[in-house]
Amino acid sequence: MLLIPAIDLKDGRCVRLRQGDLDEATVFSEDPAAMATHWLDLGARRLHLVDLNGAVAGKPKNDAPIKAILDAVGDDIPVQIGGGIRDLDTIESYLDAGISYVIIGTAAVKNPGFLQDACGAFPGHIIVGLDARDGKIATDGWSKLTRHDVLDLAKKFEDYGCEAIIYTDISRDGMLSGVNVDATVRLAQHVRIPVYASGGIAGLSDIEALCAVEEEGVEGAILGRSIYEGALDFQAAQARADELTQ
């Protein structure tokens, strides 16, 4: 079970949002590269970056902190990034810079052909981010709820050749209200590629619940507010996950 610290970038800072609301940002660090090094030192095996300004603008907006993070930890662990990735040139520039995985969210839903092209052009490097509320997909930084069913889209995107799916229950994200294990397992059972849980992970019991369903295809979790506010000790959580799943 891979536990992945999240670094959400807004205006060059490391922040956390509540339910995706940009106006509800808590600043946790003015130095995202130092934060990346902090998680590496605590044993993180991968980092999850989100360009929040980019997600709104539809193009990368935090180039300097992203470069600083890659300079700090890029030789040591894989780094994945999402937010505002709408064209193949952006993907190529990220991969050339040292990013290991690029996460496509809104663009995959609005323009499936783009996702298909990306999976073909950069096999093994494309992860799809599916953000949902009550089983329906949300787009545009979660501001728009669609009629698309999560399971249907996941299967379609798997067929395109994406590497993995990050599933976020947006009603729980940043709320520390507990991970939606049932919905995550339903999705994982529906596809053959790895699924990573995101949103609402509040403490060790959530990690243990996810470890119990690893064999269903839930292979990891993105950790945000819980590890920044101290509700979850990252080192202890990864150690417990290793104990339960190895």
From Swiss-Prot:
Known pathway: Amino-acid biosynthesis; L-histidine biosynthesis; L-histidine from 5-phospho-alpha-D-ribose 1-diphosphate: step 4/9
Keywords assigned: Amino-acid biosynthesis, Cytoplasm, Histidine biosynthesis, Isomerase
Localization in the cell: Cytoplasm
Catalytic activity: 1-(5-phospho-beta-D-ribosyl)-5-[(5-phospho-beta-D-ribosylamino)methylideneamino]imidazole-4-carboxamide = 5-[(5-phospho-1-deoxy-D-ribulos-1-ylimino)methylamino]-1-(5-phospho-beta-D-ribosyl)imidazole-4-carboxamide
Enzyme Commission numbers on file: 5.3.1.16
GO BP terms: L-histidine biosynthetic process; L-tryptophan biosynthetic process
Main location: cytoplasm
Keyword check for Cell membrane: no
Domain of life of the source: Bacteria
Active-site residues per Swiss-Prot or TrEMBL entry: D8, D131
CDD domains named in the record: HisA
Family, similarity comment: Belongs to the HisA/HisF family.
NCBIfam families: 1-(5-phosphoribosyl)-5-[(5-phosphoribosylamino)methylideneamino]imidazole-4-carboxamide isomerase (TIGR00007)
UniProt protein name: 1-(5-phosphoribosyl)-5-[(5-phosphoribosylamino)methylideneamino] imidazole-4-carboxamide isomerase
The encoding gene: hisA
